[in-house]
């Protein structure tokens, strides 16, 4: 699916999304109920080791055969049953998501209701990529402010950090929350440079160092005043607990696909809530399928910071859900329809589909 504009980060440029969807049919008595999952892997293994073609391969060759031998498949079984296969959390998450969606539809209940979410809407932030010029960046940010987004996140990298942040802070003023995301672009030796961002009163700096460098993040947290938030580093509840314990993680970005699914995402939320660590829900340029589920998840009480759950139109001119995600007065509604909170626009999906593969027991 083409993006409405190129989205550049420190690891590359996205102009379209090659999206892998999973559709399952679960038997409930005499009926079949469908469920949908969205794999958040990118086309290339740049954000993480996973990529779309690889995710499809591992699903077909290794993951689905292990699920098919079960007498009945439940969302709670997916992670345990697939634990013998190392890695591939995004592929596993897409399968769990599809099964969970089907289970909830069969029970005629919503994900938000099962989670006990009480709020009716969540604040919406927007992620702004690296631009060709400061003028282009400022025009984009002003447009998002005009659209009502309550928090701005800027992608940064060496050579595109201090000046863009200074210019954007001047544009939006001191009261609008502003944060930056480095996507692992810096090294331990960059602490003095990153401390120059402190004067801009940032909400956080996200994943400044490589994902495996928890100690480096802990040391950086002592060098700068801006809170350090982890993204790529947090792959499970266990790793999250370790990161918090060593002082590497003052704030957590929870992405269900990155951690293996929504059930693990809830466990991470619960641990962070108990530890007093604020969390927010990150984005992977999802369609309305993933955005709806994320909006329900982000209604949990530990999600105290605005996430990257923006409107469908932030990235796509035409979404593949019947009711695209909208931002109204800076808020996204928490979906309450059965399942994960969306219905498929089959005409739009058919128009965007490039190939199909069917796997059966």
Name each model-derived stretch.
Residues 1-179, 183-188, 192, 198-199, ...:
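N-terminal capping/lid subdomain adjacent to the active-site entrance of alpha/beta enzymes
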Residues 63, 208-209, 281:
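A short glycine-rich beta-strand->turn/loop micro-motif centered on a GG-aromatic cluster
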Residues 90-91, 131, 207-208, 259, ...:
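Residue-level marker of alpha-helix boundaries and capping positions
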Residues 150-158, 179-184, 201-212, 227-235, ...:
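Catalytic beta/alpha-barrel core
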Residues 212-229, 234-331:
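Shared catalytic-loop signature of beta/alpha-barrel
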């Amino acid at each position: 699916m083409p993006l409405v504009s190129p989205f550049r980060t420190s690891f590359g440029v996205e102009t379209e999304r090659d999206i892998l969807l999973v559709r399952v049919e679960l038997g409930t008595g005499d009926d079949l109920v469908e469920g949908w999952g969205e794999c958040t892997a990118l086309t290339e293994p740049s954000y993480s080791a996973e990529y779309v073609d690889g995710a499809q391969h591992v699903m077909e060759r290794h993951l689905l055969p292990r699920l098919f031998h079960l007498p009945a498949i439940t969302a709670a079984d997916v992670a345990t049953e697939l634990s013998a296969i190392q890695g591939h959390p995004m592929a596993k998450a897409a399968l769990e998501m599809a099964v969970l969606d089907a289970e909830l539809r069969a029970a005629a209940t919503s994900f938000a209701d099962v989670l006990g979410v009480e709020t009716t809407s969540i604040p919406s932030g927007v992620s702004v990529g690296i631009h060709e010029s400061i003028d282009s960046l400022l025009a984009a940010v002003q447009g998002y402010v005009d659209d009502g987004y309550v928090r701005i996140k800027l992608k940064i990298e060496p050579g595109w950090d201090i000046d863009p942040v200074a210019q954007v802070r001047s544009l939006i003023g001191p009261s609008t929350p502003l944060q930056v995301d480095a996507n692992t672009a810096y090294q331990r030796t960059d602490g003095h440079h990153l401390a120059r961002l402190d004067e801009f009163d940032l909400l956080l700096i996200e994943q400044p160092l490589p994902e495996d460098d928890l100690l480096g993040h802990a040391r950086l947290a002592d060098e700068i005043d801006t809170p350090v938030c982890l993204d790529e580093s947090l792959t499970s509840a266990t790793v999250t607990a370790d990161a918090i314990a060593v002082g590497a993680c003052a704030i957590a970005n929870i992405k269900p696909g990155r951690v293996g699914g929504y059930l693990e995402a809830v466990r991470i939320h619960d641990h962070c809530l108990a530890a007093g660590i604020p969390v927010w829900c990150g984005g992977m340029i999802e369609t309305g399928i993933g955005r709806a589920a994320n909006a329900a998840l982000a209604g949990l009480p530990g999600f105290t910071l605005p996430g990257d759950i923006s409107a469908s139109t932030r990235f796509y001119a035409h979404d593949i859900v019947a009711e695209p995600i909208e931002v109204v007065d800076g808020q996204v509604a928490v979906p309450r329809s059965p399942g994960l909170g969306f219905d498929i626009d089959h005409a739009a999906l058919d128009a965007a589909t490039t190939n199909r593969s069917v796997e059966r027991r």
